């Protein structure tokens, strides 16, 4: 005879417990993102998701700034390491000329280069275990699955823009279909042991069935639409 009453009491107790648990869950603070206020260099952990269409230099710079802000380094002026080619009367822009003078350090405080000359020499410390993301993470390279080592730069080994004509910037970072972008290798490795394969900023042009600039195209050759960000000030 007491079974319905017992069942009701148990149900009420369970409901009360669920309410308390829900309230406690709502009071839990959001996980704190890792902070690196002294960071002045990183590789984006992900791209905006539209292949090599970064919204031009302005969009890429804003993306760098947003990622840095999330991890405590937003007080600096961030620039994407990207060149653009001369077109429609607009002059070319060199990645070399837009990222400040250095020195630059990664999430962990490791110096990646002391100056522009150092950065564009064999003395720089860039590589898979040093070129970390804004979260302090390593980007997988050759030998890992997936391989994401291609980094968009549109630049020569000296950090300069390519001459007008053959596209090397996916239409100055506005195309996610036709075109091609020069990429570097974050891990300094490739299919061959040559200077291009070991280059952090000028290894090979992107390519693929969609035209060369889509997210799928970039992934097909070992990329993911990632790019370097430097604090210019």
Kindly label every feature range from the protein language model.
Residues 9-19:
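Bacterial N-terminal signal peptides
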Residues 24-233:
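Secreted/extracellular ectodomain signature
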Residues 1-10:
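Bacterial N-terminal signal peptides that target proteins for export
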